[in-house]
């Protein structure tokens, strides 16, 4: 069995030179021994641009019966750029159905995932992010009888438990001079470094086991 990942920069794989940024999809195989993971997530992609660039079509030439297709977007679907933007209740949902139908056409099993949360603390409170998109994923999963990994809710709870300062270690907060890729430091509350990627990869693997999709 092979697990294919369709997604954006939060799931994507990175080179050592780009450290410490790390996507959860990059580490998923560490929590699923013996399972082949093909991480096709790519930074800057939405449900729309991933399709228009032929990335799902490429997966179609490889995916086989019994494989899994993990589908996680949103961060770039919210963009104002016309080539990326989708509406949560119309074009976003329709696009997700294309991924679901493609997997099923080849006998593979689709798995829908809500996005990981943004680390948005204000006055001691963790703010909601992503608008209606997580709900749109949940509704479609129920309508189409697709397993749902609610990473948005899982990550919100995890970040909230760690608190404002404690959750910085999950995301791309680095000191000046600590990494060549970030000579001036960084404070990014969307992308993860290894600690965050490990946590979210572990949650994903655990959910797949709970669904009985992997052993």
Tell me what each language-model feature is.
Residues 1-42, 57-65, 69:
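Serine-esterase "nucleophile elbow" of acetyl-processing enzymes
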Residues 46-54:
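Structural motif
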Residues 45-46, 150:
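Short, solvent-exposed coil/turn linker segments
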Residues 13, 47-48, 79, 121:
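Glycine/Thr-rich phosphate-binding loops of Rossmann-like dinucleotide-binding domains
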